[in-house]
């Protein structure tokens, strides 16, 4: 049985005991992030991960941009231009049961914003010994919209997203539960001083004994 097949009861139980989701507000936000390595176990699919509550996130929204004049790239009419609106990322931190704005980073390119995001990361390694294929220290993960192409290529969209539309949400993952696809074993990891992994491990042990 894989983590995908166990997902619903596992998420429900960890939510009930306050280790993920809305009930885990002491650890971080209610957002749930699952990184599934699909297919059979192989050198390309070694582990799946359920990320624990995050205490920091990056949110990027669509700024107000003047649409490009009508043209047809499919007919060879490709119009290159320099993006004049900077990409703005809002760093938010989880405090007192809510997300609060902490600071803002901005750049002319997506790569530039992601590079500046390194200043809000940490080099502290996870306790325990994660599988070779798994992260050894906290990392950023989440969703990026295709419309971010506005800051990766010299293009102006004819139909850009509405102003304020969310283009990117990245969570800083400082704790996670991983499934070794070759053995089916589950292991929880977190940084020093964080008992989240111990609590998850205890819940898993109790579940196996039942």
Which residue ranges define each predicted feature?
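Extended accessory regions or peripheral subdomains of proteins
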Residues: 1-104, 139, 143-210
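Short acidic (Asp/Glu) patches
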Residues: 110-129, 153-164
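Acidic low-complexity segments
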Residues: 127-135, 141
């Amino acid at each position: 049985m894989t983590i995908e097949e166990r997902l619903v009861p596992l998420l429900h139980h960890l939510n009930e005991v306050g280790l993920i989701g809305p009930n885990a507000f002491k650890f971080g936000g209610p957002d749930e992030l699952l990184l599934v390595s699909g297919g059979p176990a192989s050198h390309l699919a070694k582990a799946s991960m359920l990320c624990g509550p995050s205490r920091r996130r990056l949110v990027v929204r669509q700024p107000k941009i003047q649409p490009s004049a009508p043209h047809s790239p499919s007919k060879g009419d490709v119009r290159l231009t320099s993006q004049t609106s900077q990409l703005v990322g809002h760093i938010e931190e989880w405090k007192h049961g809510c997300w609060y704005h902490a600071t803002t980073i901005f750049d002319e390119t997506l790569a530039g914003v992601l590079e500046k995001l390194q200043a809000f990361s940490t080099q502290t390694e996870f306790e325990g010994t994660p599988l070779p294929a798994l992260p050894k220290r906290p990392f950023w993960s989440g969703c990026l919209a295709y419309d971010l192409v506005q800051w990766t290529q010299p293009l102006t969209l004819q139909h850009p997203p509405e102003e304020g539309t969310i283009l990117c949400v990245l969570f800083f993952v400082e704790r996670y539960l991983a499934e070794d696809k070759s053995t089916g074993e589950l292991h929880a990891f977190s940084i020093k001083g964080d008992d989240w992994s111990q609590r998850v491990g205890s819940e898993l042990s109790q579940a196996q004994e039942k």
